[in-house]
Design a protein with these regions (language model features):
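A structural signal for alpha-helical segments
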Residues: 13-16, 20-23, 30, 52-66, ...
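C-terminal helix-coil-helix/basic helical segment that borders enzyme active sites and/or dimer interfaces
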Residues: 36-69, 83-91
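Short segments within alpha-helical structural elements
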Residues: 77-84, 115-119
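Extended amphipathic alpha-helical segments enriched in small hydrophobics
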Residues: 1-48
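Generic structural signal for well-ordered, non-transmembrane alpha-helical segments
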Residues: 26-33, 65, 69-76, 102, ...
Length: 139
């Protein structure tokens, strides 16, 4: 919010007075907060189970991995919605927006955020089907 507060669009409207930018900012904030809550809640649940001497089931691990990946992609999609409304100056190397956008997208390229295998394995679990041994590594 701080970066956008005093920005003026090409049409001369302050970002703080543009209802479309404000709507996108509120929606993005909600998506990021929702992703954060889902991620922390799931990790806390698994942590508590381990702390109590238990071991998470393959299903619990699979669901948490699915949520972890989805949370990352949701948060970056929310960032994209803000970036798309940040004007041409956002892409300048001197802009913190550019750095945040780049870092978020690079983070999604890490193997841990690869959707395909994680979602595939999770769907097999949820359908009660056997997960091939090679896919268990992504869980």
């Amino acid at each position: 919010y701080e970066i956008q507060k005093n920005r003026v669009s090409a049409t001369g409207v302050l970002a703080k007075d543009d209802p479309y930018i404000l709507r996108a900012a509120a929606e993005a904030a909600s998506e990021i907060e929702s992703a954060r809550i889902q991620l922390i809640e799931g990790i806390s649940r698994i942590h508590d189970k381990i702390a109590a001497g238990g071991e998470p089931t393959l299903q619990e691990r699979s669901n948490q991995r699915r949520n972890q990946v989805r949370c990352a992609w949701r948060a970056v999609s929310a960032l994209d919605e803000i970036f798309a409304r940040s004007g041409g100056g956002a892409i300048r190397k001197s802009s913190p927006m550019q750095r945040h956008w780049r870092d978020a997208h690079v983070g999604l390229q890490h193997m841990i955020h690869t959707e395909g295998a994680v979602f595939h394995a999770n769907s097999l679990h949820n359908l009660g089907l056997e997960t091939p041994q090679g896919m268990i590594v992504v869980v």
